[in-house]
Structures are given as C-alpha cells and as structure tokens.
Amino acid sequence: SADRITPFLDHLPADERAALAHVGAMLGRWAVFVDPPLHTRLRALMNKAFTSSALAALRPRIAAIVEDLLDAYVESDNPDFIAGFAYPLPATVIAGMVGVPDSDLDLFKSWSDDLATFVGSAQATPDKRERAERSAAEMTDYFGSIIAERRRHPVADQTIIDHMIAAREGDDALSEAELVANAVLLLFAGHETTTNLFGNGLLALLRHPDQLAILAADPTLATGAVEEILRYDGPIGTITRVGLEDVVLHGRTIKAGERVFSMIHAANRDPRRFEDPHRFDITRKDNRHIVFGYGIHFCLGAPLARMEGEIGLPALIDKLRDIELLDADPPWHDSLVLRGVKSLPIAFRASRPTLA
C-alpha cells in the first residue's frame, strides 16, 4: 500500500494524533499516499490539469526564468548554487503554475522545509512534528484563500489550480480539501526534486570534468545528461510502501503493517540492468532508470522536471565557465526520501553576453 500516513497516525496516542490534525488531513489526501480506487480518481482528475500542451506552453517562460536567475546569480555575492539557482528555478516555475506570487517564495521555502523534514525523516521528533503541523495549517489557509478567490473571480491566464478546479470526470470533481492538499503536493514535489536534480547534477559534472567538457562542447546532449544525472545520483533515495498482508520475498518475511523501503538509488546502480553502473556517462544508451517511480504512482511532474533540466543545464554551463567546487564534500539533506545537497558553493567565471 502507498498509504503510510494512516498507519503512522494510528500508532500514535490520541493526544499526539490530535496534534497532527492538519498535517495528517493534508498528507492523507496527497495522491502519492493513497491507493486505488481513490488514487485512480485523484490521478484522473489531476491529469486533466497536467496536459502535454500545457507543459509545452511553459518552455519560453522557463527559458526566461533561467536567464534571469543566472544573471542575478552572476551578480550575487552568495556563491551557493542551490540558493542562487537550483532552488529558485523550479520554485518560481511551479509557484507560477499554481498561482503563487514570487514574493511568497521564501514563505513557501520555509513551509516546504518543515514538511520535508517530517515526511522524509527517519525519526519524526516532537519538534519536527510541531513545525510540520504549523506549516500544514498555514498552507491549508493560504491555498484555501487562493482557491476561493479563483472560484469567485476566474481569470483568462489560467493556472494549474484553475484547471484542477474545473476538472471533471463525469459528475465528479475534486473536493475543496483535495484541491488544497494536492496543490500543496504539486508545489512541494514540483521544486524539491528538481532542486536536487540541479544540485546533484552539477556536483556530478564537476567531479567528472570529462563529462562536463563533453556537454559544454555539445549542448544537444542535455537530454541524455539529465537522464544520466537522474540515474547516477537522482533526487529520490527511497520509495516507501506498507505491507497489506504477510508475504515472503526472497526468503525474507514482510509482515502486514511493516514499512518497506525500496532503494531507488541502489536500483539505478544495478549491474544486472546497467553496464558499468557506477560510471557517470552522459552518452549512456538505454538509460531506463526508475527515479520517478513505476506504475500507477509514476511521478506526474516528471515531464516538467525533465524540461527544466534540459533547458537549465546547457544554459548554466554556457553562462558559468571554469566552475570549481569551493566545498569538496558538501552537506547532504538528512532524509530517507529526498536525496540532495543542502548547499553547493562554487567559483566560476561568467561568460560575456553575446552582442546582437
């Protein structure tokens, strides 16, 4: 089962469960944490808002955001690539898609960090629970207001929120609580994974300068480079499921109610699937990794993450020359789920702009 929220809450004493009312209600409605038939229903309605044509229309905007952020990063005194580019790019893109103004990005960064430490932590300490509950309550109020305003005053320049409000499957539509919860999911998942794609990706390229040189010489290899980054050091470490009944797998008994951690990072280095799996090679062929999951829970935002990587990666390599790591061993997030560096300070020489 994908539902690991209900078992977690059910094991808590009543007072502790009540103290997580908002975060429990929100996560319990996330499409990634529910099973069919509810998942089938949510996914069908959300798919109507995440069409290929809607994503394709975002390409010029993403390219413009990339250029603006790189220009600002070059002029900044902060060498941290995560703070200067890897975080604000996907955050700005997804915020615009769900109708959140850029002025609120710092607020959402704080909320998202609180959720990430709760969802991905090996141990949800009282402090992590308290911060996650507070942020879930604030996000519920925030998106509830946005959705109410969109219902009252529809706009011509529609966001994913507008499409989710309008989505219908027969007479069925997303409820208010489902709209709020999955708007938060889109914002959360829509930037966390792509931030790690860029952070882990640049780190891998800098540790393999031959591959960086190949990509710099031929930017058309960006698509393959993104796929190899996703395989070699992708943004997701594990995918968790809960046993519904006792089952024996490879001689090991998994009991009903036990959590099973699928190590996606390890699977993408499986020598039975990939030749020389620990080698980073942006020209690798047949690179069918599973970083975005598999089956009915395959990541809804995978095409968007790939598009951002394919646009942003060659642009930053063109803009930032002679890149060097200022910290050979950067810190990583403490998470069982997400895999990414917290910060990545670099030195570089900015390329001169092309004169028209």
Where are these regions (language model features)?
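Cytochrome P450
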Residues: 1-356
